């Protein structure tokens, strides 16, 4: 009992499935559009945008060449403010913001100026350091080049799901960055409590204006409200999807970050499906996690064979 055949263990350890590789804490990808709350924070706090600033999306950002595209191209979103930009995940809004943050005192574009501002706010959200979880975790990487692409979560941004979870937790609670923990309590052999554990505060984002949090929360709430994926829930949610490009030979990675209930969050969620094609798949997993958390009796619904219908409720990224 409690033993494993060495040949079988070797097969598991060397197999292509990599079952001993903890993807949640060790696998890193670009965050895609889940990064846009950081870009919005930077833009609002640095004065590049406010609640009334709009950017017109024609489907392509033509200020630079080659011109990066919005996911809706060849269509366009039209004029959007920051709340609508999060709701619709408009890339052009954030291309423009990443460009504007890189304009120097002479009116010239300097990508480093833009990435420095994005890095500042990403670090405030804890993305310049590990999450504190008690198992091995890969070191995060905040993008240091291409401010236009970095503003939509591309560039050289590279994070684990655990790090994205800590970030969205800080979004949900308006600026408290916690160290993650997997340990609830320790007991002795007789079940007597040795120590209770709780997440410890890493840092607080006290300098961020309450109006900034309000706008970001509104955008994430409207993203969920406008998606049929989340229809019929008996609790409110806020969230943001993401699609991270790998290369032309592989499907995109897809992500979802969110929290619930939207008004008084109890739960934060981060989902990534490597090479997952459609962010709707990640969104539905995030939704189902929340459903089971608040209604444990619904767990049986997740094994009804309906996985083939996933991903139909969300367009774009």
Mark where each language-model region is.
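Short, charged, low-complexity patches
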Residues: 164, 278-287
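Intrinsically disordered, low-complexity acidic/polar segments
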Residues: 266, 278-280, 296
